[in-house]
Amino acid sequence: MTFTLGFCLVLGLSTSSFAQGTLYTLLTNGPTAKRINVVVLAEGYTTNQLGQFLSDATNAVNNLLTAAPYQEYKNYFNGFAIFVASVESGSDHPISGTFKNTYFNSTFDSYGNANFLTIPPNDWNGVYAQGQGKVDSLLAALMPEHDLTVMVVNDLEYGGSGDSSSGIATLITSVNLFAPEIVVHESGHAFGTLADEYTDAYPGFVPVEKPNATTNANRATLKWTSWILGSTPLPTPPDPTNAAVVGLFQGAEYQTTGWYRPKLDCKMNHLFVNFCEVCAEQLVKSIYTLVRPVDSFLPATTNFTIYSTQAVAFSVTPLQPLTHNLSVQWFTNGSAIAGATNSAFSLVPGSLGNGLHTLKSVVSDPTALVKSDPAGLLKATNTWNLTLSLNDLALVSAQYLASNRFRLTVTGTAPAGFVIQASTNFVTWTPLTTNSLSGGKFDYTNSSLTNFSFRFYRTISPP
């Protein structure tokens, strides 16, 4: 689905306000507690530029969710925007002597890089409260369930940054022509904890192990070894014949040698290139770190007793990727039930018998985008602990007595008690007594019979 928004639609948006900021809902795919919530912040937009910001914010969300692998999981995301006005449009460019009065005090030229667009604390302004502190306050007040924060800076200069080291995913982009690519690349940092795969030296940068960057050249222990064919040499020569394979290519994290990346090229190395298999896998696992594959399950109570032999309905509601379905398998007492692969399952209690039992549903994502999931992120298990105490009644030992009386014995199990009923036509049944079993039986003696040539008897347990 393509979501577009123009200035004429601003008044139709869902909004919520707090002091300086107003929250707008851009995209809803489910409750915030069960979706990944992308929040776009306005930086360098004046009061009369609200419409422009909402358009830019919507484009930022759309651009992110139309890029692989996000597109396949776009139904897992919600989109929001927070508008806060700046006194002036744009952003600081200290090297050229340009300074703007903006709400988050954003600046280019950070840490010696003209395109490194940041907010405080940074090398130009170390005061947390004048940048990231404002972000945190707005999010706490307006969208505490945020998962990915995107700050759109109203400046045409090429620039951006991404940081997840603080525990709060923050992505910053300008509105440059390349902004769509900047957002996707920086999401690799902010959302997937991915490393830059650049090989050019960056003085002072200290490389660390990341999902897509390593110093380990051992095939057996390499973190992305599941993607590497046995025929691929390690390290992998950086020539065109190896462009399509996952291997071990020298150069990553601003290091020419000693550090390796998974593929010859990738979104984390150059714009307008797709994420490689290893980076895409990491992003999918990051998605499942924040949302579970199951939206809901019924019954909501997972510990209960079943007294009746009537079938009991169970169900799960899996999330829905764009082009494939999640798989479902039902288990009883740890054993897979043949053919039980739908989201709904009808349990026949009599097939299990009395006692303690477990019913389990396992919902998993069979995507080919992930080959290694040791933490089981792509799988959700719901377990119901069941105590079956089923009624199993019989009328036995009929014995005729004097004065048209007789005795019956009720045997079996009836945790909820039982009723003895009588009928002359199998249609209308009259209750004669309600009681409970003692030691697995109950002896019933009728009163004197009158006006019946014959009568039928049965015993049932109340539902």
What spans do the regions from the language model cover?
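Short, composition-biased motifs enriched in small/polar/acidic residues
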Residues: 362, 382, 387-463
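Active-site-proximal segment of zinc-dependent metalloprotease catalytic domains
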Residues: 20-34, 41-46, 58, 62-203
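Bacterial N-terminal signal peptides
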Residues: 2-14
